């Protein structure tokens, strides 16, 4: 999408991959020191070696320190950190560990609707029971415990719900859950004995005024031993999102909290089957959780680049909401975080009937027409799940500002034309 890579991350990666560059005076000293520290933690001082299945020990230690800083000093144990091939790998691994049983005793997993399709796909592959709970679109996609209770009680008629998945900030919905909401969810999980999976890969992507990222772990521990000693939690982060956007490195981690020792041994066996996560991805993760510090040569440039990326995304989030809400028949909630908007669109009844006659969801029909006539590619809301009778699409806010502005105006014009064409 034209985003310039973060210089520090690419410089350290370059040296790690080609250590001869340690002798090149073009690289700042802190870059060389960081690369050398990572290489010395690798087998044979090379990124080409296997690592321990749980990940390089030094990187896991740095991840723990990062979590402690993020969460205001709440302790994190490197032994509870599992490095992974992006967050997706550890999410699927955790689901494999948790899913069991047959028939009515089959594990049910509560997932938000709309959801990131990784979850529904993984549950289908594992033969788990998908239990949908709906986010509240009228309240900016907030999570409502009453809705969780409804979903859980309905599910208990045909499966054994054991797991609650949360995506915060949201994908595809771009919301940031409030601290109160997280506290309510933790109480609910404790009361119902649910394992919580907190997908927090967009934790750096917060744009809306008044919104803040609260990690599930931090809130859990601040609620005191009644909850922090009881609720089982796995939280996930990735190198693919945030300000870095280094998807191809496939770096990520999972932290587990309150996991029984015997179960944790089984988790370690499970991750050992895939040998180890990509070592270059582990190295990149280390640079992200242990970035340049004030006074170091790379600090000013690193912070300037990071703030520029996040500031630009915040401006595009505001722009997307503003332009789409200026179109009759499109309703776009504020993009509080993450990288997407998920606007609701009106589709005339004639277009709905035509789509159904062609075996298509109405929003897929709309998205295909949009692609054919404008070249703009968005994803139909039916691919993520939505309430019956509503239609949405997901679009990213990643294109450069001027291109995004033009794209949004063309999309707005197309929707108006579409409404006219298919209205009575």
Tell what function each PLM region has.
Residues 1-54, 58-424:
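PLP-dependent class I/II
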